[in-house]
């Protein structure tokens, strides 16, 4: 964002050559002596004016030094920043203590976690031992059941053998009884053959009977043994059944005990798992807090670095404003004393608001460094606008002051062109919200300064006239007439015209005459023919060849400056001040700005003074105020105002009617 303000001060030359009675009455030999005397008087006046300017500069520098000392004594943003830094350091210490406490808690939690882990491992080992014992008991119970089943099968087999033996013995006993009965019947029915035969047969029968009895006794013994074996097996069976029931009861009781113990162990395991999870979550929270604390500590360090950089930037900016402020920026435009009280306080408050804002970390737009430069430039503009106007006391002095962003270079032709450079580095700047508030306050201060010094509009007298037309054409209109100037940038503004009437003094003290704005020049070649005709008519007794030699050079500088300003560079304002050989000509040109740039149309002006035989003079001031609405990248709505004051000196001759009425050249805005 560019901001330019052109303030022109001009001194009206004397009108000795334009008076017909003066040169006609003098003889031809005295003309060179009179010219030399006039040149000597002009040189003396210039030296006196320079001495007064140096005195004014010294006084202004002294006042500025006092103002800066008072501003340094007042509690500024450094104290607030120091308190903020102290608070941040205290907070960092608290965070460090909290970090140490969290580390201790983390160590305790880790120790508790290790204890819980060891307990959990011991419980797992006990559970494994109990599982092994239970498996072993289950195996023993299975083996006992298998042995019992085997014994039951053997008892069943023995019972079957016993029953089979009983049946066989019963059959044998029946057969023996049947055989005995048959033998008894035979003995009873058969005749006794002889005693010997009977004795033999009875002997045989007795033998068979004995043999049968022996067999029966043996069989009975075997039967008794089988019964005893059965009873023994039954006793073993009962014993085995009792052992089986006892084992079953023991197994059942062991299962119940183990189930209860397993349930208790499972509950303890669940509780330990929950505690471990809680400890892990607390550990994660602690680690997250530690990371947050580290990030906060780094952020605080970055903020401290940014605050230090902002303090250094503001200190260098104040020192650069104090050191690099030119004479024309400190000295009032018309010799009035400079007042820095209210503007310095308001600007200091606005700068304090800007520096107190929280800076961003990244992604700075390109327009912000330029806006930082505008703050320091607005300080200088407000000091110039606060200074009241005062008529000068010495003629033939031309000062052109240009406040822009560029380097300071002397103008062509021995003039003084001052262009302070205040550029801010691409450092971090405050955030958008607080910047908008601070710039709002700054805009209010500038608007109050601009609106507070507008002069009233007096009624124009009837016997005065002006030769030029002052028209500002905005919008989509375009005219070919060189008297009009069209702007393609939508602007809002106004034109204030005021006419002041005063009488010329014969002692050489005249009212200041403003500069005449030059028409737009294409490609830096030449000027319109109508303008050249006016120059030739109103510049009597001047060296035209010298002026023509300087005009193309100035126009080329103007075209080059216009091109360079479109690229973002800044050039000083070339100024031409008449020397001793050219007392009646002073020419000033300023570089034009690109219409497609961010600042809208800039003012082009030049001053050309001519002589006339007038006794009564008046000054017509045309103030053109342009307010261009711009939307920046951060959605901050700003208004840029460019004020151009063009003063036209209009004279009307009352003493001599032969040469007619003459006026100064046209002015164009």
Curated annotation (Swiss-Prot):
Species the sequence originates in: Mus musculus
Chain positions of site Interaction with MIP: 457
Membrane topology of this protein: Peripheral membrane protein
Posttranslational modification: Proteolytically cleaved during lens cell fiber differentiation with increased fragmentation as fiber cell age increases.
TM ranges: none
Name of the gene encoding the protein in the UniProt record: Bfsp1
Annotated stretches, region: Disordered: 380-435, 449-468, 505-618
Modification type Phosphoserine: residues: 5, 339, 513
Gly residues bias: start-end ranges: 408-417
Name of the protein in question: Filensin
């Amino acid at each position: 964002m560019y901001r330019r303000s052109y303030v022109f001060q001009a001194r009206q030359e004397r009108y000795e050559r334009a008076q017909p009675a003066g040169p006609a009455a003098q003889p031809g030999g005295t003309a060179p002596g009179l010219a030399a005397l006039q040149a000597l008087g002009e040189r003396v006046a210039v030296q006196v004016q320079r001495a007064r300017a140096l005195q004014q500069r010294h006084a202004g520098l002294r006042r500025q030094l006092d103002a800066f000392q008072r501003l340094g004594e007042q509690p500024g943003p450094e104290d607030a920043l120091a308190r903020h830094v102290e608070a941040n350091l205290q907070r960092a210490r608290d965070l460090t203590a909290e970090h140490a406490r969290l580390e201790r808690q983390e160590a305790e939690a880790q120790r508790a976690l290790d204890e819980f882990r060891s307990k959990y491992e011991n419980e797992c080992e006990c559970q494994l031992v109990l599982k092994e014992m239970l498996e072993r008991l289950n195996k023993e119970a299975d083996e006992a059941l298998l042995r019992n089943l085997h014994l039951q099968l053997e008892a069943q087999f023995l019972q079957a053998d016993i029953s089979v033996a009983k049946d066989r013995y019963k059959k044998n006993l029946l057969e023996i009884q049947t055989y005995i009965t048959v033998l008894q019947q035979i003995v009873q029915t058969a005749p006794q053959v002889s005693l010997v035969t009977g004795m033999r047969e009875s002997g045989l029968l007795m033998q068979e009977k004995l043999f049968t009895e022996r067999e029966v006794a043996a069989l009975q013994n075997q039967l008794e043994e089988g019964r005893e074996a059965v009873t023994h097996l039954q006793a073993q069976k009962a014993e085995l059944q009792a052992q089986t029931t006892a084992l079953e009861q023991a197994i059942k009781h062991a299962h119940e005990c183990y189930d209860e113990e397993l349930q208790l162990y499972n509950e303890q395991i669940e509780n330990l798992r929950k505690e471990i999870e809680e400890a892990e979550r607390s550990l994660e929270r602690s680690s997250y807090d530690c990371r947050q604390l580290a990030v906060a500590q780094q952020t605080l360090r970055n903020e401290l670095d940014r605050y230090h950089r902002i303090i250094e930037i503001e200190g260098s900016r104040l020192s650069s404003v104090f050191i690099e402020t030119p004479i024309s920026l400190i000295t009032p435009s018309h010799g009035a004393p400079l007042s820095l009280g209210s503007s310095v306080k308001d600007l200091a408050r606005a700068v304090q608001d800007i520096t107190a804002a929280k800076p961003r970390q990244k992604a700075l737009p390109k327009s912000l460094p330029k806006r930082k430069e505008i703050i320091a430039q607005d300080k200088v503009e407000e000091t110039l606008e606060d200074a009241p106007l005062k008529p000068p006391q010495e003629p033939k002095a031309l000062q052109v002051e240009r406040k822009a962003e560029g380097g300071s270079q002397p103008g062509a032709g021995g003039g003084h062109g001052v262009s302070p450079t205040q550029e801010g580095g691409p450092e971090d700047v405050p955030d958008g919200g607080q910047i908008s508030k601070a710039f709002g306050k700054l805009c209010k201060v500038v608007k109050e300064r601009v609106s507070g010094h507008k002069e009233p509009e007096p009624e124009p007298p009837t016997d005065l006239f002006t030769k030029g037309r002052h028209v500002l054409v905005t919008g989509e209109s375009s005219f070919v007439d060189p008297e009009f100037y069209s702007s393609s940038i939508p602007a809002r503004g106004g034109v204030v015209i005021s006419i002041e009437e005063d009488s010329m003094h014969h002692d050489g003290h005249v009212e200041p005459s403003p500069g005449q704005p030059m028409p737009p020049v294409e490609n830096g070649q030449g000027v319109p023919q109508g303008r050249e005709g006016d120059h030739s008519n109103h510049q009597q007794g001047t060296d035209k060849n010298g002026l023509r030699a300087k005009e193309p050079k100035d126009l080329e500088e103007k075209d080059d400056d216009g091109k360079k300003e479109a690229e973002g560079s800044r050039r000083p304002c070339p100024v031409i001040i008449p020397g001793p050989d050219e007392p009646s000509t002073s020419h000033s040109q300023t570089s034009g700005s690109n219409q497609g740039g961010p600042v809208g149309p800039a003012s082009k002006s030049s001053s050309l003074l001519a002589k006339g035989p007038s006794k009564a003079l008046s000054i017509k001031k045309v103030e053109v105020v342009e307010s261009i609405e711009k939307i920046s990248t951060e959605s901050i709505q700003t208004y840029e105002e460019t004020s151009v004051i063009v003063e036209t000196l209009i004279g009307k001759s009352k003493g001599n009617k032969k040469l007619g009425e003459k006026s100064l050249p046209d002015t164009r805005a």
